[in-house]
Amino acid sequence: MRLFQLLPPFLKVIFLTSAWTLTALAQQPKPSPTKLAPELTAALESHPGLVYAQYGERQMQLDLWRPKTAQPLPAIICIHGGGWFKGERSAMANLAQALAAKGYVTATISYRLSGESKFPSAIQDCKAAVRFLRTNAAKFCIQADAIGVTGLSAGGHLAALLATSSGVKQLEGDGGHAEQSSSVQACVAMGAQSDLECTRISELSSKPNDPFYRTFLGDSQAKIPQIYALASPRHHLDQSDPPLAFMTGELDDASTHADETRADLTKLGIPTGLTLIPNAPHAFLGQQQNFNICLQASEAFFAKHLKDSRKP
């Protein structure tokens, strides 16, 4: 500590930034070590590496699974986390396959990270993926009017933003299939920040060594409040939004409970809820017990709002 005090100010900033970033990296979701039964995966057909959007030479890909049946099924997009600056779609592969085995077409997507392209590129990619699935609904036997989304951490934020920002032109992007809607019909946001205009995020983004919000959005909340509003799921809430549930680990920050956002949803008459996984951390999918709780709760919510509500 004494050596740290002797450092010049600019080196202190570099040191603190590195320490903050390494801590954050350690807390971000990693590819899940949870196991799936061989007979489960054997019952699925897979379509890896599908190009859902292209920007110049940059191809955006997704991996898709579905049961080996010709019956049209609801779809669920699974979005990985990583602080918007890291992560891979493979981190959500086990959850996607487990949901597919329950009777869904599922897709894990890659999106442009903040080191490549800042907001709104990531959400524009998510919307492009929805439009791709609708365009190819007949090919993959998807019920085009029953598409859900889930995600963890940064992916949870993007899932919630996807759910609440239907029709917001600035977020649509030019990823193709513009004739299709990017709306979704149900969302489970996990470990997600749903209010980017709150005081907590204002304080976090004001720190020069903030590796998340300033990197993702371009500056602090105080400097660009309009961008934080545009990126905030809560900011876009209205009566047209789909059912939106939240899930988080008991040991995660209380902000992921989305208390104010859920209160707003309730006032609007939109189904919502909170699943709190006991003794679970932020990146809870890597533990089998937590994974099982997540799968059960997610599938129950999606079944109610993507399957049961559409039965004649």
Residue ranges and their predicted role:
Residues 240, 246-248:
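Short beta-strand/loop motif that positions the catalytic acidic residue
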Residues 128-202:
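Primarily recognizes the serine-hydrolase "nucleophile elbow" in alpha/beta-hydrolase
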Residues 90-108:
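Short amphipathic alpha-helix adjacent to the substrate-entry channel of hydrolases
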Residues 72-82:
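Short beta-strand element of the alpha/beta-hydrolase
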